[in-house]
């Protein structure tokens, strides 16, 4: 699979008034290392895909973001590029019944409505 990159600029992203903007490019990845992600919560697997998926789940949960567009990414193991997995927008995204399918890649991009404008360029 080839890596995907969005070309939406921040000014375009501001068009959406519904969601908080989560600029993933400004996240300090060094402060969110594996020690912040408990491997025992990874369904017994520590592959790069599952680890990264759990990484974003832990990040958004700890940040306690509300009414935000949650954008999860995984790393493609073949070329280490960032791929979109799933967007999640619900009233209570921090509920215990978190529906994010760990490790399931998204086949094609089909974001609809203003949510597309919430996606900023994702940098490694």
Curated annotation (Swiss-Prot):
The alphabetical list of record keywords is:
Chloroplast, Plastid
* Localization, UniProt: Plastid, Chloroplast
List the GO terms this entry assigns under cellular component, sorted alphabetically: chloroplast
In Swiss-Prot or TrEMBL terms, this protein is called: Uncharacterized 14.4 kDa protein in 16S rRNA region
């Amino acid at each position: 699979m080839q890596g995907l990159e969005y070309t939406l600029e921040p000014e375009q992203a501001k068009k959406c008034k519904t969601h908080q903007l989560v600029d993933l490019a400004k996240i300090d990845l060094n402060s969110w290392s594996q020690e912040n992600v408990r491997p025992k919560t990874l369904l017994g697997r520590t592959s790069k895909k599952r680890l990264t998926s759990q990484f974003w789940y832990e990040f958004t949960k700890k940040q306690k973001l509300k009414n935000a567009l949650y954008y999860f990414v995984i790393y493609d193991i073949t070329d280490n590029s960032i791929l979109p997995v799933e967007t999640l927008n619900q009233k209570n995204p921090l509920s215990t019944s978190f529906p994010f399918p760990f490790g399931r890649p998204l086949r094609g991009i089909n974001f609809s409505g203003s949510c597309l404008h919430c996606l900023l360029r994702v940098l490694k």
